[in-house]
């Protein structure tokens, strides 16, 4: 990495702090507000300079698409698989379910992302998850009420906010036009929690 100016180092330090405390990079507006820049454009120019010097990678189209590069290693990352249609009873990451692989670093998300899922519809629009977005998912069965989860019912995969009351699961949309999905675990045997949402990549990022 080439040497940084004092201001560039200040921006880089902010990126690292924000990642450590929130699990995601700051937006340009957040950088500007924190460091007293007059506009988000000023933050963008500093980010471009950091990118040219090899300190970060900017992922186009994602408002938080900033990855801090580990300059101790030049290893390339493998990318994240995009999961398509899923057959009931098979692992979600089975080879036949993988439609593509995107060159996205899993460590850009906290906790680390394991796969991407394309979002269909607007049931989660009130939390900024929009039709066509790529949702980054961390595979886990250890989930809490209130988290946004990826759930599978038979061969249907859905993204909703979780609420569990005893043996009843409520999967809540973030759009008042959609009713909750109710699952009785004593009756529905083909139900799985596949993971939690850890980030999104806006739907025009890969055009």
Swiss-Prot record:
NCBIfam families per the UniProt record, alphabetical: lexA (TIGR00498)
Enzyme class, UniProt record, top EC level: hydrolase
UniProt-listed Pfam families: LexA_DNA_bind, Peptidase_S24
Annotated catalysed reactions: Hydrolysis of Ala-|-Gly bond in repressor LexA
GO biological process per UniProt: DNA repair; DNA replication; negative regulation of DNA-templated transcription; proteolysis; SOS response
Top-level taxonomic group: Bacteria
Native source species: Haemophilus influenzae (strain PittEE)
A GO MF term: DNA binding
HAMAP family xrefs: LexA
InterPro entries xref list: LexA, LexA-like, LexA/Signal_pep-like_sf, LexA_DNA-bd_dom, LexA_repressor, Peptidase_S24_LexA, Peptidase_S24_S26A/B/C, WH-like_DNA-bd_sf
Protein's UniProt keywords contain Lipid biosynthesis: no
Subunit architecture: Homodimer.
DNA-binding region ranges: 28-48
Encoding gene per record: lexA
Name recorded for this polypeptide: LexA repressor
Protein purpose: Represses a number of genes involved in the response to DNA damage (SOS response), including recA and lexA. In the presence of single-stranded DNA, RecA interacts with LexA causing an autocatalytic cleavage which disrupts the DNA-binding part of LexA, leading to derepression of the SOS regulon and eventually DNA repair.
PANTHER family per UniProt: LEXA REPRESSOR (PTHR33516), LEXA REPRESSOR-RELATED (PTHR33516:SF2)
Family named by the database record: Belongs to the peptidase S24 family.
Known EC number: 3.4.21.88
Active site as annotated: 123, 160
Site (Cleavage): 88-89
Keywords annotated in UniProt: Autocatalytic cleavage, DNA damage, DNA repair, DNA replication, DNA-binding, Hydrolase, Repressor, SOS response, Transcription, Transcription regulation
